[in-house]
Amino acid sequence: MAPLACDPTALDHAGATVVAAGESLGSVISTLTAALAGTSGMAGDDPVGAALGRRYDGAAAKLIQAMADTRNGLCSIGDGVRMSAHNYAVAEAMSDLAGRASALPAPQVTGPLTVGAPPSAVGHGSGAPAGWGWVAPSIGMIWPTGDSAKLRAAAAAWATAGANFMAAETAAGGGTMAAIGAQQIPEGAAINKALADASSATADVARQCQTIAAQLNSYAAKVDQVHAAILDLLSRICDPLTGIKEVWDLLTDEDEDEIKKIADDIRTVVDNFGREADTLGGQIEATVSAVAAATENMSHWAGKEWDHFLHGTPVGRALNQVGQAFKGVGEEGWGFLKGLYEVSPNRMLLDPVGYGKTMAGMVEGAGTLVGLGPDGVPGAFDAWKALGKDVTHWDEWGSNPAEALGKSTFDVATLALPGGPLSKLGKFGHSAADALKGLKKPPGVPKPPEVKPPAAPKAPDSGQPAPSGKPGPVAPSGKPAPGPADGPLPHSPTESKPPAGGTPPAAEPPKPTAAPHSGEPKPIATPPESVGKPVTPAPAEGAPAQPHEPVSARVPPTVPAADTPAPSAPAASMSAASGPPMPPTPSLPEPASLPSGPSGDLPAETPPTAGIPHSGEPSAPSSVPPHFPDTPTHGLGDGGAHGPPESDPKNANGHGPHDASLDSGSDHHLPLHPLDSDDLAALAHYTGPGYQELNFALREGALDVSQQARVDALQKALEKLPVYEGAVVRGTNLPADVLEQYRPGEVITEAAFTSTSTDHTVAQSSAFAGNTEFRIWSTTGRDVSSVSMYPDEKEILFPAGSKFYVVSKTVDPQTGRTIIEMIER
C-alpha cells in the first residue's frame, strides 16, 4: 500500500479555491443573462428571422445550462476536496493520543445555481420603411425585421462571457492541481481527473460562447446588407423613407412594369438572404451538440453528494450496528426465499426429482432430531443442541454480534413458516450429525502417483575404465537458479521485459534415436508435488537462461542428446486427468549470441496461453542482449509488465510466473468478445518476445509490412479486451533529455504501446524501481492479464498513439525518484 502523507489544511485551502472559482463562474453567468435581457426580438419575426431565432433560442438555452452545470460541477468538486480534507483531519485528530490535533470543521455544501432560458430572439425588431408598401404586394412577404444593433449587443455579451468564463477557471486551475498533487492520498488521481474534466468543459463552453458571438455578428451583417440592398432598389421608384413617387409617374401611370421588375430584384435579394440565414442556423444547431457533451460530463460531477466520516461518534457507531443487523436480515431473507421455493408446489411440478430429494432429506433430518437416525448418529439431545447453534448463529456472535442478531431474529420469526428453519430440518439434521461426529473434514490432497527412482548406473565391465564426464540426467529443482549479484535486475512489470528468446518456456524433451537398453529403467523427472500440477521438465541442452538466471550460469551437459532420456513435459504429466497432451509448437529462435549445445536447435514448447504465433513472422534480432537495457531511448520507456515479480517463482498453485494456464484459477477479467487465434497470437507475441521490436519501429516511424500487420492485429485484439478505469503505475529509467519533455499542463503522445501495472507494491519495489515513476489514471487502458504470458504482473496495456495529460511532476525527497502523474486523454 502506498504511504499516506496529507496536509489537511493545504488540501482544504485547495478545495476552497476550487469552490471560489466555481462561484466566480456563477457571476459570469449572471452578467450574461442581464445583458441578454435587452435583446428580445433581435432576429425579427419575418420567416427568415423567425427560423433563425428559434434555432438560436435552443442553442442559447443549452449553452447557458452548460455554463451552470460547469459552475455547479466545479463547486461540487471543491466541496469534495474540502470534505476529503475534513475526513483526514478527523482521522489525524482521532489518532493523536495526546489530543493536540484539532479537526477541521465540516465544510458547508455549496448550493446549486439554477438559470432560466434567455429572452427569445423571435419578435418584432425593426420596422419597414414607408416605401416598402409599393413593392410588398408583388413580393408576397414582409420586411426583414431583424435588429442588427441588438444582434451585435448580444454577440458582445456572449464574447465577454466566454473570455471571463475561461479566465475565472484558469486562475485557480494550475496552482490547485499542483497543491493536490503534492498530497499522497489515494483519491489524488481521481481529484486531478475531475479538475481536468472541469477544465476541459470550461474550455468547451468558452469556445461555444465565442462561436455564438461570431454567428450573431455574421447575421447582423447580413441583415444590414439586405436592408441596404432593398432601400437601394426602392430608391429607383420612390423616396424609400417617405414613399412619395416621382411626378412623372403620377402623371403617366406607366411605372407598373418598373415596380414589378424592382420587386423581382428585391425578392432575389431576400431569397439569397434566406439561404444564407438557413446555413447560419445550421451552424448554430451544431453548437447544441457540442454543448450537450460538456453538459453531460459536468452534470455528473454536479450531482455528487459528499459526506463526512461518522467514525468515532455515537451516531456513526449506532448507524453501523443497525446496518450490520439489516445486512444479517437480508442474507437470511434470501435464504428464506430459496427455502420457500424448495418446498413449494411449483417446484414439485417443475423439478419432481429434486423436490423428492428435498422432502426425503427433511424426513431423514427430522428423524435425527428425534433419535431415529441411522446407527452411529449422535443422540437427539446433541442434534438439537447443534440445531440451536445453527438457528441462533452461535459462532457469529463473537465476530459480528449485530449481524448475528439480525440473522437470529429473522430465523426465530420465520421458524415455523414454509421456507423457514423448520423447512430445513434435513440440512440442519445432517449438519448437526456431521459436526458432532467430526465428519466435516477438509478435502484431502490426493496422494501423488508413485514414481520409481532412477536406476543406479550400470557398473562397467572388468577391464574397461569407468566413463568420466558423463553425469546422469539431473532433475530440475523447480526454481530458477539465482543470478549473480552484479547481474541485471529481474524483468520489471513496469519497465522492461526479456527480448526474444530471453525467457523461453520449458524446452521440448529430445527424442532418443535408439531404443533404450532392455532391462534398464528409464530415468524420469522429479515426481510432481501434487496431482494436477505439471512436472517441471529438465531444461533442454542449449536452452536459453530463465529470467532470473544469467547466461553464464548454464552449463551445457556433456551427454549426447541421443542418450538423454526425455523428461516428462507439463502436458504429459496431466494426460491422465485432462486428455492427450497438446503437441509442442516452435517458438521464436534463440539469439545467435547465446551459446548452444548439441541439441540447441530443438524447438521450445509454447506456453499454453501464448497461442500459436503467425507462421512466417520474423524472429527477434540476434543482437538483442539477454536483458533489456535499463534506460529507454524514447518516451515512457520500452518496458512492459513482462517479467516475473520479485517473489517465489512458484505460486500457491505450483505454477511459476511463466506457467500461464487457463485453469490456474486466476482472478483476471475475461475478454469482452471471443478471441480468435490471430488475437491470441498477437497478444502472445507482444507480451512475450516481440514488444521491443514493435515499439522501437513505432517510435522510429519505420514499420515494415510485417510489423504493421502485427501492430494492426494487436490493436484489433486489444479492442476485444475489457477497459480498465483506475490508477496504474509504471517504473522506468529515463535520460534527462527525455524526462525534460514531461512538463505539467502538456499532452504527451506515446507513439508506441505503453505497458503499466495495477500492482503498486511490486512496481515500487527496489528490484523494479527506476529513476522515474509514472502514476497514470487510465480510462481506456486494456486489461491483458488474462491472456498475457505473465498474468501475475496484472498488466494494463495502452494502445499505440495514446495521449496523456501531465498533471504534475515532483521529486520524492526520500528516494530521489521523479514522480510524474498523468491522466489518459
UniProtKB/Swiss-Prot annotation:
Q: Which GO terms describe its cellular component?
A: extracellular region
Reaction(s) the record says it catalyses: L-arginyl-[protein] + NAD(+) = N(omega)-(ADP-D-ribosyl)-L-arginyl-[protein] + nicotinamide + H(+)
Q: Which residues form the active site?
A: R730, S755, E795
UniProt KW rRNA processing keyword: no
User: From start to end residue, where is composition biased (Basic and acidic residues)?
Assistant: 656-670
Compartments, as annotated in UniProt:
Secreted
Record-annotated TR mART core domain positions: 650-825
Q: For bias kind Low complexity, which ranges apply?
A: 560-579, 590-599
Q: Which SUPFAM superfamilies match?
A: ADP-ribosylation
Keywords attached to this entry: Glycosyltransferase, NAD, NADP, Nucleotide-binding, Nucleotidyltransferase, Secreted, Toxin, Transferase, Virulence
Q: Which Gene3D superfamilies match?
A: Toxin ADP-ribosyltransferase, Chain A, domain 1
Compositionally skewed regions (Pro residues) per UniProt: 443-457, 468-491, 580-589
An example molecular function term from Gene Ontology annotations: nucleotidyltransferase activity
Reported function: A probable mono(ADP-ribosyl)transferase, it may ADP-ribosylate Arg in target protein(s).
Family as reported in the entry's similarity comment: Belongs to the Arg-specific ADP-ribosyltransferase family.
Entry-linked PANTHER family? ADP-RIBOSYLTRANSFERASE, SECRETED EXOENZYME S
- The name of this protein is Putative NAD(+)--arginine ADP-ribosyltransferase Mav
Instruction: List the source organism.
Output: Mycobacterium avium (strain 104)
